[in-house]
Amino acid sequence: MPWQNSSILRECDMATYANVLIKTPLGVKAEYTYKVDSDLEDKIKFGERAEVLFRGKKTVALVAGISHEEPSFETKSILRILDDNPIITPELYSLAEWVSSYYVSSFSEVLYSLISFKNAKFSRVYEFKDSVQQENITLTQEQDNAIRRIRTSMDEHKTESYYLWGVTGSGKTEVYFAAMEKMISQNKSVIYLVPEIGLTHQLIEKLTARFDKTRIAVLHSALTDSQRLGEWKRIISGEVDIVIGARSAVFAPLSNLGLIIMDEEHDSSYKSDSFVRYHARTIAYKRCQTNNAFIILGSATPSIECYKAFKENKLCLLRLTKRACPMARESEIEIVSAFRSATVISPRLMDALKETLDEKKQAILFLNKRGFLHRLECPECGWIAMCPHCAVPLTYHKNTNKLICHHCHSEYPAITHCKNCYAETTTFRSYGTELVEEEVKALFPYARVSRLDRDVTSKGKNVFETISRDFYDKKTDILIGTQMVAKGLNFPNVSLVGVINAMSGYTMSDFRADEKLFDLIEQVAGRGGRFLEKSKVIVQTDDISSAPLLAVKNRDINGFLDNVSAMRQTLSLPPFVHFARIALRSKKEEKASDAISKIKNYIMDLYQNMLNTNKDKIPQMNIVAYGKCSIEKLNDEYRYHLVLSSKKVKLLSFLISETIKNLTPIYGVRLESDIDPDDLL
C-alpha cells in the first residue's frame, strides 16, 4: 500500500513528510514530497486534500503517503489540510491504479477525475424536493419472474451478472427497485446509473417515494463543486445506501457495495470523452468483481457487446417482452419516404399530428440536429460555409441570426451571398429542431409547442426539468427535441412519435453507425403508447431500405443484432477484438503528420521485437487506421490518428504505454489515447 498509519508515525519524535499527487498529464511527474509541520501532524491522513505551493501557485494536492524518511532534497511545507477525513478510500485508490493501467491514462488525472470538486472549500448537501406519493404497482408475470430470480440469488449470496432485456415501457425500473430493496435489507449499498443527467429528475421522484430520501445521494456533473463535495462526504461517511447519477457516479465511494444497476446500458454517453476515456460499464464490472457485488444491466436495445456476452452465457439474461400497462399495445410503425421532400413535415405526419391534437393526445417529434438550417451551400459553384477553425459546415440559428459551429462554438454573422462566386442565392442541405418548431407552429398555431435541445437547456438551470414536467402535466401538446427526448422519459399521454429525418447524423465511417441508428429510433419510438391502446410511430427517411429502420418496423431486433454481430465478427471489429487509438492534435499539420508516423514506426518495431523474442505467446496485433482523422481539423488543430486492434487489450495498453513512456514528446503536439473507443471520427 502507498500509505502508512500517520498516528503510528507521530509516536516517533521525527519530522513527518507527505507524498502528494498533483494533477499532471500522462508521462509528467505527479508525485511530490512536502514537509508536514507539527501543527498539521495530528490532522493529516492518506486520501485527504492538502493545499501546497507548487511552481509558485497555491495548488490542491491529494495526500498519497506519509513517512518519516527524510528526503535528500529541500522540501516546502504543506500550507493546510482541506478535509477533516479522507475523501479517497483504499478501494478507489486501487481502482484508479487499474483504470490508469487499462486506459493508459495519467494516474493523477484518474484520481482527480473522481474528485472533480477538488477546489471546493466547503460542502452543501443536495436538497430533494418533497416526495410524491408512491403508486400502487401490479407486477406482470415477467416482472415477477425476473424479481424472483434475482432475489433468490441474493438470498443465497450467489453473485450473478444479469441483463434485463425489456421492451420500452415493460417496467424494468420496478425490477431494479425490487433488487435494491433486497440489497438494502442485507445492509448493502447500491449505485444506480443513468446515461443522462436529465433522467435523474423523474427517477429521483420515484426513488424518494419508495426509499428513505435521507439515505439517497446524487452525483453528476451538473452539481456545483460544493454540492458534489457534500454528497461525496455523505457517501464516504456511510450515511448513504443509494447513489444515483450519470457515468461518474460509478466511482461513488460507497462502503459495502452490493449492487450496480446500469440502465440504458447501450447508450454512448457512458463512454467518457474527457482526459480519462473510461467506459462506465467496464468500471462497473471491475468494481463488482472487487466487491463481490451483483450487476444488473438493462435496455430495450442491448449493445452488441452485451448481446455477445449473454449469448456466451457471461451474463444471465432476463426478458420482459410485454409492456407493463395492461392496456398498452405495440405502436404501429410506418416508414415514409422524405427523399427530395419540399417540406419538413410530410403530409402523412401532418395528418397524424392533426388527428392526435383532435383527440387531446400528445406528440413527440424527434430530429437529431439542433439549430435552424445546416450546410449552407452555393447552388452555382458548390461553395459550402465551413467553420474556419474546424473542418465542418456551420449551422444557421435563426433566433440569433448567426452561423454557429457546433464543435468550437464560434459565431459568425449570417450571410446572403456566396463568398466564392458572390452569387446572391444560397441553399441549405439540411435542417434542425429550430426550423421544425417554426414549421409546426405555422401548421398548428393553436397547439402548445415546446422544444428540448441543448440550445434551449443551456439558457438556465432546471430548464430540462421544467419543459419535461410541463409535457408530463399535459401543459404542452407537441414536444420537439433531439436525443434528449429519446432516452428513458415516461410520458403517459403520447400517442404519436414522429421521426423527422431518421438518417440525420448517420455516418458511414463509424463502424457502429447501424447499431446507433437502430438504438436511437427504437428508443424514441418507445416514448409513445406506453399507457394507451393505440399509438403511431411515423419515421421519415431518405432511405426507406435502411436495414436498421426495417428492423424497427418489423420488430426484428434479434435478427438485426445477429446480423450486426456476424458482420462485426467477419470483419474483426469490436466486440470480437479490442481497438486502441492514439490521436494527435497540432496547430501545425506537418508536426502532427510526422509525429503519428514516428509513433506508428515505434509501435511496429516494438511489436516485432516482442514477436522475435517469444512469437508463440504474443497475440496478433493489426493496424486498422492510420493518417488523418475523419474530421481533419477542430479548434484550429489538425488531427491524425493510429488505430490498433487485438483480441488482447493488455497488449494494446502495453504498446501504447511503452510508446508514450519512451518517445520524446514533440513540442506543439498533443497526444490522446483511447482504449475501446466509441467511434473513430
Per-region residue spans from a language model:
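Long, largely alpha-helical accessory region at the distal end of helicase-like NTP-driven motors
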Residues: 567-652
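A general secondary-structure junction signal
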Residues: 22, 65-67, 115, 367-369, ...
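Accessory, non-ATPase domains that flank or precede helicase/AAA+ motor cores in DNA-metabolism machines
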Residues: 1-299, 306, 311-327, 618-620, ...
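A general secondary-structure signal for short beta-strands and their flanking turns/coil
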Residues: 13-17, 29, 464, 534, ...
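Residues at or immediately flanking beta-strands
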Residues: 364, 393, 448, 620-622, ...
